[in-house]
Amino acid sequence: MPKINGNEIRPGNVLEHNGGLWAAVKVDHVKPGKGGAFAQVEMKNLRNGSKLNERFRSADKVERVRLEQKDQQFLYETDGMLVFMDTETYEQIELPADLLGDRRPFLQDGMTIVVEFYESEALNATVPQKVTCKIVETEPVVKGQTAANSFKPAILDNGVKVMVPPFVGQDEMIIVNTETMEYSERA
C-alpha cells in the first residue's frame, strides 16, 4: 500500500490508521502563524461507522488504501440480508441491508450498484446518484401557486418523503438525487 504525506490527504481517500480503515470525510489544511502546517481530518470508520478527528502534520506518513470497486446487481432480500450478483462473474453474495445506510429505500429490483471491497470484505455500497421514483401521495396542483419558489411534501413509492415543486402531481414519475434526497426533475 502506498504511503502519502499528511498534507496529501483528500476527502474520499481511504486510510489505514490505528489498525482500522477510515474514509476521509472532511479535510482542512491549516497553516498557523507559529509552527508547522497540518491537515485536520474528519474520518469515518468503514467497518463500524464511528467518527474520528485527527491531525496530521505535513511530514506524517499514512497508508492510503485502494478499494476494489465491483458492479453488483440486486436480486432479492432475505432475513435482513441483500443478495447481489456480480455482473462479471455471476457469483452471488449476501450483504447486510445496513451497508446502504439511508439510501436503502432507493434500492430497486435489478438495480446495479457499486460495492467497494477491501481484501474480499465489502465495506461500502452506493446506489446510483439519480433514481426514478413514483409519487404516491401529494397535494393536488393549485393554479397560481407557481409565482413563488415554493415546494410541497410528497411521499414516494419507496416511503421516502421529498419536497417537490407545486406543478408535480400524484402518480407522476420523478428523478430523485440519492445523495441529497431531493427532487431533481420529472422523469
Swiss-Prot record:
InterPro entries: Elong-fact-P_C, NA-bd_OB-fold, Rib_uL2_dom2, Transl_elong_fac_P/YeiP, Transl_elong_KOW-like, Transl_elong_P/YeiP_cen, Transl_elong_P/YeiP_CS, Transl_elongation_fac_P. GO terms for biological process: peptide biosynthetic process. It is found in: Cytoplasm. One of its GO terms (molecular function) is translation elongation factor activity. SUPFAM superfamilies: Nucleic acid-binding proteins (SSF50249), Translation proteins SH3-like domain (SSF50104). One of its GO terms (cellular component) is cytoplasm. Keywords: Cytoplasm, Elongation factor, Protein biosynthesis. Belongs to the elongation factor P family. This is Elongation factor P. It comes from Ruegeria sp. (strain TM1040).
